[in-house]
Amino acid sequence: SVLHVFNWVSTLFMKPIPDSARRAIPFKFMIFSIAFIIYGGATAFLNAQIAPDSDFIHNTYWIPAHFHAMFFGFSGQMAIAGFYFLYPYFTGRMYNQTLGNWHFWLWQIGLFIKITGMGVAGYLYFPRWVYDYLQMPGWAESQLFITIGGYMVGLGFLIFVFNVAWSARYGKPAADDPWPVEGGEAETAAPAAPAE
C-alpha cells in the first residue's frame, strides 16, 4: 500500500494539473482516497502486531475503524471517482457540479468523523459484536460521533443518487471530450445527449 501511495503521489507531480481538473469531482475523490488509505494504513500497524492485537484492539471498534477507512475511505471513493469520471460517457450529460460538491464534502467530513469516532471507541475498549453494553466513560460520546458521521455520509450518498438521476435527464450535454487535458488518455467521444 505504501508503494502505491508513493506511485500515485509522484504521478501527480509529473505534469502540472490544470485548474479545471483540480476542481473536478473525480479528482477530489481520488485525492481524498489517497489520504484515507494513509489514514487506514496507519491504523493497520497496530492490527499487524501480535501483542496490541490480542490485548488491546482485538474485537474492539478499532477493527471497524480500520475497515471503514480502507473500504469506504479508499476503495469506495475510488469507485465513486471512477463513476463521476465515466458519467458523461455513459449518459452524454454532465453531472451537477454543485450537488457533486455537496456529496463530496458531506462524504469526506462525515467519513472522517465516523472513522475517528470508531478509532477512539476502540481505543477505549468499546467491544464490537454486541448489541448491549455497559456505559463506560467516553463510549456514549464516541457513539454520538459515529452516528453523526454516519448520517452525514448517508446524506451525501442520497445527494449522489439524486444527482445521478437528475443529471441524466436535465444535466448539461457533455462535450465530445468532457475532460480536456493536454496529452489526455480519453480517446473516445462521449455519446450525444438523448433527444428530449
Residue ranges and their predicted role:
Residues 14-22, 182-183:
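Membrane-interfacial, low-structure loops and terminal tails that flank and connect transmembrane helices
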